[in-house]
């Protein structure tokens, strides 16, 4: 809208200067007789020769004055236009910033309790309270987890029981890889290996192991057999993924 009015203003100014120049050029000029009690002595020929020069000189001076005024006016106009454009851009940026800030406050308000007021001060104060409350809860949870882990480690050390685990795998791709993977998995479960008796053949892989563990023997067997099936799948589709080179 500002650009529209600025364009109309420029057009009106140009028309104004054109009218002034047209008046000066003699299209619609009004001559004013010079009244004086004295009259200079000149011949008729000299008067006819000098009158066009005098008239032309007056017109040139007036044109120069008009051009000078127009130049000064355009310079002022050119300095005012960028300032208006800068103010307009600043206003748009400020409006965008306030809109983003409003959306941020609304998003934060949606995460707070239902009874929270929707003014900025209430939102910020309630958010600070909620953050402090969450930090206290976090510290309490960390403390409880630490206590449970310490108790679990102590109870586990006292309740370790010895049991036998038997695993069986039909037509293994690599009995050695299967055995190594079973031992590695038992170690990751926190068990202690006592004895191992294994049988390798192209038709079957079987192993009987005596271990100390907190978990029931049946559960250990299921987990180890499931892990061996995953190992067979890896060896079948990824032949280069042999576990033998990792030990």
Swiss-Prot record:
Pfam families to which the protein is assigned, alphabetical: HLH
Chief site of localization: nucleus
One of the record's GO molecular function terms: protein dimerization activity
Nucleus as UniProt keyword: yes
Protein name: Transcription factor bHLH92
Keyword Transmembrane: no
Localization, UniProt: Nucleus
Subunit structure: Homodimer.
Organism: Arabidopsis thaliana (Mouse-ear cress)
Domain bHLH stretches: 85-134
Any single GO CC term annotated in Swiss-Prot or TrEMBL for this entry: nucleus
Keywords: DNA-binding, Nucleus, Transcription, Transcription regulation
Xref: CDD domains: bHLH_AtbHLH_like
Coiled-coil ranges per UniProt: none
GO biological process, any: regulation of DNA-templated transcription
